[in-house]
Amino acid sequence: ITNEAFGPYTVHWAYDTYSLSKGTATAAVKAGGDTWFFITADYAFGHDLEKDASHFVEANGGKVLGRARHPLNTPDFSSFLLQAQTAGAKVVGLANAGADMITAVKQSSEFGLTKSGQKLAVLLGYISDVESLGLPVAKGLLLTEPFYWDRTPETRAWSQRFFEKFKRMPTAAQASVYSSMTHYLKAVKQAGSTDSAAVMKIMKETPVKDFVADNGVVREDGRMVHDMYLCQVKAPEESKGKW
């Protein structure tokens, strides 16, 4: 919905496969993880994650040794993990999300994948996924996020309000939805109208400066350009709290 495919009344706020892949793949290769094997969800989203991550692996001097594609909602990743182990890649990139990503990480731990020296790179994951996995299993995972609740005083203040209502810290998606809707509603108020053209004009003219984006801007094609953050899951002994 952006770049050459943009429309006059659409905005793309939080992330896409390009930004998610760039941070994680680039950092992993520069840290020595220069050979990759992908375990990929076999539909458009997974294919795009794999394609974009492969581009950044190779652009930074790395090499993709292979890939295995799995159906949505796969209960058993053993054959795919065995292929990843056999390939001997330094990094196993998980180009999937949600239940598939969680299952793949859990089973990789059971297989001893990381204990044998391979690293896991999650190309889309949320803090709720890490909480579900638990730190003993998730420790060391690399992922790229547009938001983390404990990054600044502003992120902590907003996240505490969220926690008081929902009894859990917000994911990047939840924070980004709030950020985008607030920017829209402020533009409606300033325009004194819900006319799409008038509101979009103000949204694009007004910098995005809130608890999600320190220096965001809605580009002419509707993409909100902002910082992304490379994250690594702490080991249990490093963590000072549940979230």
Q: Which functions belong to the PLM regions below?
A:
Residues 1-69, 118-139:
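Extracytoplasmic ligand/sensor domains, especially the bilobed periplasmic-binding protein
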Residues 1-2, 17-18, 42-46, 70-75, ...:
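Solvent-exposed loop/turn segments at secondary-structure junctions
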Residues 7, 105-179, 188-194, 237:
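Extracellular/periplasmic periplasmic-binding protein-like sensory domains
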Residues 20-23, 68-84, 153-155:
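Structural motif
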Residues 29-34, 54-62, 82-89, 106-113, ...:
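Sec-exported extracytoplasmic/periplasmic mature domains
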Residues 35-40, 88-98, 104, 116-123, ...:
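Periplasmic-binding protein-like
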Residues 162-174, 183-243:
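Segments of small-molecule ligand-sensing domains
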